[in-house]
Amino acid sequence: NKNVRLHLADRLHQTLPLYSNLGTVGVYVYAKDFDIPGRSATVTAEAQVRNEYAEPKTFSYEVTVAETDGKVLQRFKGGTATIAAGETRTVSASATLSNLNFWSWGYGYLYDVTTALKVDGRPVDAVVTRTGFRKLEFGHGIFKLNGRTLHLRGYAQRSTDEWPAVGQCVPPWLSDLSNALQIESGGNLVRWM
């Protein structure tokens, strides 16, 4: 069995992520300008917005970064835009966030980033992206995660046929078991094939 999700959206909406047959890229959240000791970074949220109305629409773009328990860390705005009928456009908002907990090996700290479109102050579309923020560096034969050198040891795992008779329908508990076996053996990296 596979999980199925039905997405219902206003005709002014943020597109679904990276579907080549739909020509969409969705929402992309990333961080840069890290200050690891100071626990801050600049967070950017970009969203591809599509207007399927027959007339232009003016909207504001707002971002909320929250803990997974709902506690809001920061809200910031990307301004107001007018999008023509049938147009698809990318909008963006950035802010420097402080008191961040960075995602790290053995400490998978996550945030819920909500990107919202508002027309006349009324929300018409919102997308929640669960993500973590971390600084990666590759150079001189060294890998660093949040400024700390990390020796990588891992596995090459195929996305299918790893468990006989299951195929692509891997339930979450079986994925958790695979991950636990890798960690118990000292692995900290999975290369998907």
Where do the model's predicted regions map?
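Secreted/periplasmic carbohydrate-active enzymes, especially glycoside hydrolases
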Residues: N1-M193
